[in-house]
Amino acid sequence: MIKAKDYIDIVLPNYNSSRYLKQTINSVIMQTYKKWQLIIIDDCSDNKTLNLLKKFHKHKKIKIYYQKKNYGAGFCRNLAMKKSKSPYIAFIDSDDIWNKNKLEKQINFMKKNHYSFSYTYYKTFGLKKRFITPPLRFDYKSFIKNTSIGTSTIMVERKKLKNRKFTNSKICEDYYFKCKLLKRVNFAFCL
């Protein structure tokens, strides 16, 4: 029997992301760590994206919720976090692809070191292919000087999120969330 304390809820906001969405979802499904649930909040997407999402309706580990109006990524992430019941929350965006052992490595790193907030290195793709190497440790002051924590690399203990939410602004909603979270946990650590 899988213990609830080992579960990770994965938050995925989606809006008209048909180009990479299938790859994004499959990168979660293919994780070597199997104790997860994917919570997708669709933000009033076009028919092409909705048809793609329909292919995942029957997957027992994927929950999809549909908005009737476009509210933005911050609103969608907050709604998914509200629906989350697991002790850990990870974030992925609809145009990001995880390595297959991302969750396994990250949760083991957090548990072994008793960390409540972690992030990873990441690689961009598309026009500008870069390997992003963030510092090994961030506190609030160092983060506002160097904002290199990718949202799709974050895993956090749910209990540390108390009243920490994404703003509903159309830009920088993830930056403000990370700032508020770092004030609460003091430090975040890089795997």
How should these model regions be labeled?
Residues 6-9, 27, 37, 176:
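Cell-envelope/extracellular polymer assembly enzymes that use nucleotide-activated donors
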Residues 17-30:
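Short, well-formed alpha-helical segments that are part of the catalytic scaffolds
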Residues 20-22, 47-55, 97, 101:
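Acidic helix N-cap motif at the loop->helix transition within catalytic regions
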Residues 67-84:
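Glycine-rich, basic loop-to-helix element that forms the pyrophosphate-binding segment
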Residues 101-131:
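Conserved donor NDP-sugar-binding/catalytic core segment of glycosyltransferases
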Residues 42-51, 69, 93:
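A conserved acidic beta->alpha catalytic loop
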Residues 89:
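Short aromatic/hydrophobic "clamp" motif used to bind/position activated sugar donors
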Residues 135-191:
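Conserved nucleotide-sugar donor-binding catalytic segment
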